[in-house]
């Protein structure tokens, strides 16, 4: 019986991966699985979901890890009953961020109004030294233009209505942060960041500029990885995208302990024995 018996730990039970053909769509077996989509610039994460719903004629589609409209890169999509697994896709993310020094903005990115400008020129060495303060677990203040809810309202709603609201700092973990390139003339830095879920890269750009006294904001953001979803294996969102061909079995992407059983044992489990 599934009652905590030492013979079988049901809390760690998963059925072995099904063959790829089992993910094929049919009237009796609708699409089910993950899709590693490359979200382009200029559209929202929900726009990606809407396009896939039109393409597949399936309503049950969701995404994890929202990307801002100006950002691009890996956006994990859950299709069919795989949407029930969204909460398990909480792995670390990796980004390639381009930061512009010399001005801070209201949104911490290129879409906001300038709130501060400076003639201070930063050096490559300044940036490298400045990044050290973001290593490990840090306390981060989210941007006022974000979807975090405070007292039932999203922060950006307070911002748009010019209402004051107290923003609480949040603990996030920066596993890796390093300067990839620096353009002294343009005052732009390309930074690689591997971080925990919930990290705002815009805040890192803003805070870095503030710490260096020059002001800064994010002008480009590419998500290169989300857990086991890598940019190299992502698919473009085209009208001719073969969703079924590119579906990924959830078992391959989730770090859930599994127990392989034979047919006889599986039947016993199904019968509650």
Predicted regions and their residues:
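Structural signature of FAD isoalloxazine-binding scaffolds in flavoprotein oxidoreductases
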Residues: 86-101, 165-179
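Glycine/acidic-rich beta-strand-loop module
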Residues: 60-90, 157
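Acidic, low-complexity central loop/insert segments
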Residues: 88-139
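Accessory RNA 3′-end/elbow-binding domains used by RNA modification enzymes
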Residues: 2-40, 44-67, 74, 125-128, ...
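Short, structured patches in soluble enzyme cores that scaffold and shape functional sites
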Residues: 99-101, 160, 176-181, 193-197, ...
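Residue-level signal for inorganic ion chemistry
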Residues: 77, 97, 152, 204, ...
């Amino acid at each position: 019986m599934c009652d905590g018996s030492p013979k079988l730990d049901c809390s760690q039970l998963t059925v072995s991966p099904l063959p790829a053909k089992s993910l094929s769509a049919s009237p009796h077996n609708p699409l089910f699985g993950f899709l590693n989509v490359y979200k382009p610039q200029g559209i929202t994460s929900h726009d990606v979901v809407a396009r896939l719903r039109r393409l597949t004629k399936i309503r049950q589609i969701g995404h994890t890890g929202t990307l801002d409209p100006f950002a691009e890169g890996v956006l994990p999509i859950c299709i069919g009953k795989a949407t029930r697994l969204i909460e398990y896709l909480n792995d670390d993310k990796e980004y390639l961020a381009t930061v512009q020094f010399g001005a801070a903005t209201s949104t911490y990115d290129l879409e906001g109004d300038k709130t501060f400008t400076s003639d201070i020129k930063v050096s490559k060495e300044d940036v490298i030294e400045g990044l050290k303060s973001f290593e490990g677990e840090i306390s981060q203040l989210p941007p006022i233009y974000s979807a975090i809810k405070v007292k039932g309202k999203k922060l950006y709603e307070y911002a748009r209505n010019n209402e004051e609201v107290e923003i609480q700092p949040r603990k996030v973990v920066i596993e890796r942060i390093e300067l990839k390139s620096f353009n002294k003339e343009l005052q732009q830095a390309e930074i690689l960041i591997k971080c925990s879920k919930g990290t705002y890269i815009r805040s890192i750009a803003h805070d870095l500029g503030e710490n260096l006294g020059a002001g800064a904001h994010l002008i480009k953001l590419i998500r290169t990885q989300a857990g086991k979803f890598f940019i190299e294996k992502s698919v473009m969102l085209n009208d001719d995208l073969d969703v079924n061909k590119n579906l990924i079995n959830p078992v391959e992407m989730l770090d859930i302990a599994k127990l392989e059983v034979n047919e006889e044992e599986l039947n016993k489990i199904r019968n509650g024995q």
